[in-house]
């Protein structure tokens, strides 16, 4: 959960504190005043913070609250799912589904975007060792045929269906529910709120990053290992210089422009839907390692 810290004038804070105190209301005794004084003297726990153009915002880590509530009702297993790679110009969308073990939840789980690469790698290994998970890929060809949203939802659904144990409830990040054989709950900003979705976001991100490093060896010159296929200036320059590779998404505007420059006679290639579900383990994901 993200909250903007309100900038309240010092006098307003003092007035509010005075109204709230037992002494100000005239009904407090010395013990209450002493307890209030100790509570005021004790520093409050500091939430995680990040900087933005509007100042400092408090960021609470994801919790296991939703999963635990279902577990108490006898609804288990519960899976969280998320994807990585909607925005890039090259490479697949990678979707992951994770069922956490309530008794072996790795510490430090968070939205993959709020973690460093080193933190993601460390948590990825812990998730693989303690959780049930599956990964599915939507190829650039499928993205071209179905569009990025439909391809992403397809991959998320396939990842859930590939889990070693069928879940009874699924949490998915975003606004859209997916086609699964159980109740599906879409949670906007779920990778920062629901712990199992956060775990899935890490698995998807690390898997895709490793895959793009492997594709960089197959197609040198584009810098996939650096930008992971996103449309940064270095990637756009390489695309303009070399033209599209087989790993680029043919219908994304910068790729279309590069193809017109290098292959003005060529049609958009016919989609070759090679992307199938792949259930992976920690060692199998170590692509290019």
UniProtKB/Swiss-Prot annotation:
Transmembrane segments: none annotated. Its EC number is 3.1.26.4. GO terms for cellular component: cytoplasm; ribonuclease H2 complex. Pfam families: RNase_HII. InterPro entries: RNase_HII, RNase_HII/HIII, RNase_HII/HIII_dom, RNaseH-like_sf, RNaseH_sf. GO terms for molecular function: manganese ion binding; RNA binding; RNA-DNA hybrid ribonuclease activity. The keyword Manganese applies. It is an enzyme of class 3 (hydrolase). It catalyses: Endonucleolytic cleavage to 5'-phosphomonoester. Manganese or magnesium. Binds 1 divalent metal ion per monomer in the absence of substrate. May bind a second metal ion after substrate binding. Residues 1-55 are annotated as: Disordered. One of its GO terms (biological process) is DNA replication, removal of RNA primer. Residues 76-264 form the RNase H type-2 domain. It is found in: Cytoplasm. A divalent metal cation binds at residues 82-83, 173. It comes from the Bacteria. Residues 7-24, 31-55 have a biased composition (Low complexity). Keywords: Cytoplasm, Endonuclease, Hydrolase, Manganese, Metal-binding, Nuclease. Its cofactor is Mn(2+); Mg(2+). Its main location: cytoplasm. Belongs to the RNase HII family. Endonuclease that specifically degrades the RNA of RNA-DNA hybrids. This is Ribonuclease HII. The lineage of its organism: Bacteria, Pseudomonadati, Pseudomonadota, Alphaproteobacteria, Hyphomicrobiales.
């Amino acid at each position: 959960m993200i909250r903007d810290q309100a900038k309240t004038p010092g006098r307003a804070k003092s007035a509010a504190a005075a109204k709230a105190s037992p002494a100000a209301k005239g009904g407090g005794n010395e013990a209450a005043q002493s307890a209030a004084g100790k509570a005021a003297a004790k520093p409050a726990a500091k939430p995680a913070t990040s900087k933005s153009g509007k100042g400092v915002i408090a960021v609470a880590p994801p919790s296991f609250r939703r999963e635990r509530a279902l577990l108490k009702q006898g609804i288990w297993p519960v899976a969280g799912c998320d994807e990585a790679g909607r925005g890039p110009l090259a490479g697949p969308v990678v979707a992951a589904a994770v069922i956490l073990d309530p008794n072996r939840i790795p510490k430090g789980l968070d939205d993959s975007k709020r973690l460093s690469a080193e933190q993601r790698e460390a948590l990825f290994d812990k998730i693989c060792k303690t959780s049930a998970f599956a990964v599915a890929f939507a190829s650039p060809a499928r993205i071209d045929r179905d569009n990025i949203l439909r391809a992403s939802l397809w991959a998320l659904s396939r990842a859930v269906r590939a889990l070693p144990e069928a879940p009874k409830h699924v949490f998915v990040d975003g606004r859209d529910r997916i086609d699964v054989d159980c109740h599906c709950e879409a949670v906007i900003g779920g990778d920062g709120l629901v712990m199992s979705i956060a775990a899935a976001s890490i698995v998807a991100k690390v898997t895709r990053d490793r895959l793009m490093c492997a594709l960089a060896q197959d197609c040198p010159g584009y810098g996939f290992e650096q930008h992971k296929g996103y449309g940064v200036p270095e990637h756009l320059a390489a695309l303009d210089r070399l033209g599209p590779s087989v790993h680029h998404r043919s219908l994304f505007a910068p790729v279309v422009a590069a193809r017109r420059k290098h292959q003005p006679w060529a049609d958009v290639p016919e989609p070759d839907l090679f992307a199938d579900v792949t259930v992976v383990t920690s060692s199998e994901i170590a692509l290019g390692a």
